[in-house]
Amino acid sequence: MVRRDRLRRMREWWVQVGLLAVPLLAAYLHIPPPQLSPALHSWKSSGKFFTYKGLRIFYQDSVGVVGSPEIVVLLHGFPTSSYDWYKIWEGLTLRFHRVIALDFLGFGFSDKPRPHHYSIFEQASIVEALLRHLGLQNRRINLLSHDYGDIVAQELLYRYKQNRSGRLTIKSLCLSNGGIFPETHRPLLLQKLLKDGGVLSPILTRLMNFFVFSRGLTPVFGPYTRPSESELWDMWAGIRNNDGNLVIDSLLQYINQRKKFRRRWVGALASVTIPIHFIYGPLDPVNPYPEFLELYRKTLPRSTVSILDDHISHYPQLEDPMGFLNAYMGFINSF
C-alpha cells in the first residue's frame, strides 16, 4: 500500500513537471531573434537584395577608387555572413573600384528556405547570378574567400577552367583558413552531429541558443583575439535572422559534398594558372598547423602563402584585420 502511494505521488510529480515544462519549452522555441545592433542594422540598411530563382539574396556593393578597373568579390565562411568582412571593407575600397560581398543562401540576411537542398554548386551559381545582375559578368574578378567561401571559390575556379557558360573570369584567388582538404579538416563536435542529418538534427537546431553558439564558436578564435560579447551577438543575430538556426544542419552538408567532390575541387586548385594566395591563421583548430600547410604547399607549389602571427586562428580577417589586409595587398600588388 505504501509503495503504491509512493508510485502515485511520483507519477503526479512527473505530470506536474511535464505540465510546467511544456509551456516553458514552447516559450523557448518561440524566442524572437535578437534586435540588430546599430552597426549590424547599418550594414543591412546599406546593402541591397537581388532575386535568384524566387529567393532574396543580400549583398553589399561599394564603389571605391575612381578610375581603377579592379573588382574584388568576397565570399564569407560558415556559419556567419558577409559582415565578417566589415573590418577590412574600407581598406579594400582604397584599392579596388568595386568591393562586393553577398550573404550566401541560408546565411545572414539572405533567404533561408526549408526544406531545401543546400549545395556548394548552388552557392557558386548565386555568385555568378549576382555578377550578371550587376552587369559585371564579362569583367575580370579578384576572389577573396574564407572557410566555406573557399569551397565556393574552388567550384567557381573549376567552372572557369572548364570554360563553362556563365562562369566568372577569375583574375586572382586568395583563400583563407578554409577546409579545402577533407583529410586535414577538423569539424567541431556540433558540426559532426549535425552534418549527417540524423534524428537529432532537428532537435539540436531548435534547442540551439546564444549560449551554445558562443561557447562553440569562441574556441576557434585565438586566445588574445576572441570576439566581444557584442560581436558574438551580431553573429548570432545574423544566424537567427529568418530562423537560420533551423537550416544549419542542411548547410553543413557541404562537409559531405567536399569529401565527395574532392577530386573536382582540389584538382581545380592544383592545376591553377592564375595568381593564387593563402592567408593563414596558424592557431586554427579546424585546419591545424602544420598538417594543413604541409599538404597545401605540396598540392599547390605555385601558390604563395602569408602566415599571420602565432596567436591568430580561424577568423584572421576579424582577429588581425590589419595583418590580413596587408597580406592581401601584398599579394594583389605582386602581379
Swiss-Prot record:
Molecular functions (GO terms): hydrolase activity
Sites where a glycan is attached: 163
SUPFAM superfamilies named in the record: alpha/beta-Hydrolases
Chain segments annotated as transmembrane: 13-33, 63-83, 266-286
Motif RVIALD, chain ranges: 98-103
GO terms (BP aspect): mesoderm development; regulation of lipid storage; response to retinoic acid
InterPro entries linked: AB_hydrolase_1, AB_hydrolase_fold, AB_hydrolase_sf, Epox_hydrolase-like
Tissue specificity: Highly expressed in hydatidiform moles, but barely expressed in dermoid cysts. Biallelic expression is detected in blood lymphocytes. Seems to imprinted in an isoform-specific manner rather than in a tissue-specific manner in lymphocytes. Isoform 1 is expressed only from the paternal allele. Isoform 2 is expressed from both the paternal allele and the maternal allele.
Record keywords, A-Z: Endoplasmic reticulum, Glycoprotein, Hydrolase, Membrane, Transmembrane, Transmembrane helix
Chief place of localization: endoplasmic reticulum
Claim: Glycoprotein is one of the keywords in the record: yes
Family: Belongs to the AB hydrolase superfamily.
Full protein name: Mesoderm-specific transcript homolog protein
